[in-house]
Amino acid sequence: HPHEPLWLDVPVRTSQEAADHLGVAVGQIAKSVIFKRKSDDRAVLVITSGDRRVDEKKVAALTGALGRADADFVKAKTGFSIGGVAPLAHSETPVTLIDRELLRFDVVWAAAGHPNGVFALQPAQLEALTGGAPVVDVVQAT
């Protein structure tokens, strides 16, 4: 399978830990950040580059007002625990946005639903696997 998970011998809960273990740039880690949309309690997933911080105001401008997603909300809406949230295969389909910064790389690495699991894919494949999620500017200026 082209997206078969790579199982690491230790959990990697941050982008930096994942990059260090994989020997790749931290920006190549596609981290999944979950917010709670206030209007309907729907999960909002931002798949962002590991070396960037999500700008919540930019996301809210595209999705509506956001609230904090605690660990229970993340688990209920995605089926995954914080630290292992995959960018796809969620319990409930989230509103999904892809950070355009990921397009800097030919290959990115994402969590495979477990803190020890990651998988590689091209940013275009990530778009396809998320059902054509929009690629947008959702990060803080560097």
PLM region spans:
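Extended, low-hydrophobicity, polar/charged segments
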Residues: H1-T142
